[in-house]
């Protein structure tokens, strides 16, 4: 959901509509990549006792006879400890894919396990749930679908009095959700959304983190925009998610990361982003951005990027919504502190996590695309030179930096006057030496704006061998029209 600024007029050979078409294609590819690069994963909770985890107690692969034996002992044993021990042995065997396949092939095995899950003995219940959890971690969808008879009970136990048991059920559901559409199809009418909405009011951090995980798995389903997200938006979950992201002493980083990704998936679906904006999503995320910038100034902890990444994406995507203006969304962020905070994060990423620079620049692009006030903040805070220092990082970063500068320049003569003179022209002459077509193309666009609004730039460009820099690209099909137009402008100027 990248909002690129509107292109400027070009020579008729490469008209505005053609440029828009190319840009739409690039944006579609970017949106697709961002949707596909999601955090689809599974999580495994194992709390083996020390004596179980020792080297001399490696879990063995179980055959049919052993699986049947452990199930029989767990179901009919005379002592509770014997029954519990049988389930522990079964659970440890289920860590192996071979045992998992053996288990689901055995007739009545899942029925027996579900029976133990619903027993009135808490320890047996817990061990049966742990067995299901091991099965849920399988990479085979057939194993997940074999667990279908247990899903309604897992949902019921989300209202249990034991926070540990609720946490286990949530992670198990999350693992099953991501593996099989059949599981999701069954869980929706069984009431998973109301069950999750009830869980979000839990006072236990571990439960909230597990809830965020299960919800994020549900939101990443291919059918989520049509079949899942509308019911989530109709529940109390969005308001509670935003509360979990409010900065302050109650903010828990682990919980915040989970719910920030949940919010990201909802926003990417574009089902009802005006609703989220109306709930104050922009102001909440903007305050969280300020909080993150303050945190990176106090700590060397690189783990902060786990939260920064989804927060930046959420803000960037929300700013592309038409509803931002109609509900006063821009006003929720109209503060130069947001720009200053973003640059603190960009410097942090530059030093510690360069792969996240595009996320921050993507937000800066969307802030400046249609907002003269944010462009003014960029200039008044003297942030052009720090921005130019990011150009050598990568071609992707270079394009985004140049796009932001184009956003500023296209606001007119007053803005170009403040961009000039300075390090901008030497930087542009340097980027014209790049071999990447998109970097050079964006450099040409910025030069075009400078020539248009700051005519004195033309003479300096000529004095610094600008024409020779242009000549190396005049045979490139994607660039030659723009190169020719700039050459003519420079010579006529």
Swiss-Prot record:
Organism: Homo sapiens
Record's protein name: Transmembrane and coiled-coil domain-containing protein 6
Keywords for the protein's UniProt record, in alphabetical order: Coiled coil, Membrane, Transmembrane, Transmembrane helix
Cleaved signal peptide residues: none
Cellular component terms per the entry's GO annotation: membrane
Top-rank taxon, per record: Eukaryota
Membrane topology listed for this record: Multi-pass membrane protein
Keyword Transmembrane: yes
Gene Ontology MF: a single term: nuclear import signal receptor activity
Main subcellular localisation: membrane
Coiled coil: 15-84
